[in-house]
């Protein structure tokens, strides 16, 4: 809905401007990037070709150095550099997730939306993905994270919202939500530390 892929109800504001009627391309050009749950890579294209597609915004803005962002992505995800000529359809689930995030970062976004980045990944890869999310957060990129792994999400978040049946049931600073008995009992499944 935020990226204009589904019909919306209500209004969507970004930097004080109602962008509800904006096209997907207009939202991308404003600096909003999405990593969808299903990753949506081009499986018959190489890793590097997929990354180059992510440079659309920078290219349209006339940034002649947009290709240098590929090196930034490879610094963040060294495994992708090793597989730069490999078809993305042959990558593991964790590598595909890294590529999807890397492709979004090619646009140099102000806001990065991640939809279920840990879905279907091995625990070790989930830890690696969330470490990268934390690194990105520290660089000043605003991250909007939709995640079923509440513990991992709250560990990297500044602020959180708990949705039940599509409605906000709780919200607040992530550290407070992580200690809230309702969140612990329902989503974290562990005794609260007082």
Residue ranges, per PLM feature:
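Glycine-rich phosphate-binding loops of nucleotide-dependent enzymes
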Residues: 1-194
């Amino acid at each position: 809905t935020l990226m204009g892929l589904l019909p919306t109800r209500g209004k969507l504001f970004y930097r004080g401007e109602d962008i509800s009627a904006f096209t997907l391309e207009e939202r991308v050009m404003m600096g909003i990037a999405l990593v969808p749950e299903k990753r949506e890579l081009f499986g018959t294209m190489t890793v590097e070709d997929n990354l180059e597609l992510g440079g659309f915004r920078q290219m349209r803005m006339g940034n002649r150095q947009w290709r240098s962002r590929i090196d930034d992505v490879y610094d963040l995800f060294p495994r992708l550099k090793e597989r730069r000529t490999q078809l993305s359809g042959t990558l593991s689930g964790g590598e595909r997730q890294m590529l999807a995030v890397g492709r979004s970062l090619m646009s140099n976004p102000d806001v990065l939306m991640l939809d279920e980045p840990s879905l279907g990944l091995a625990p070790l890869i989930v830890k690696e993905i969330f470490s990268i999310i934390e690194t990105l957060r520290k660089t000043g990129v605003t991250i909007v994270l939709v995640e079923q792994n509440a513990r991992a999400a709250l560990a990297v978040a500044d602020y959180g919202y708990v949705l039940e049946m599509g409605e906000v049931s709780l919200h607040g600073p992530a550290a407070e939500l992580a200690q809230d008995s309702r969140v612990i009992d329902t989503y974290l499944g562990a005794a609260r530390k007082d």
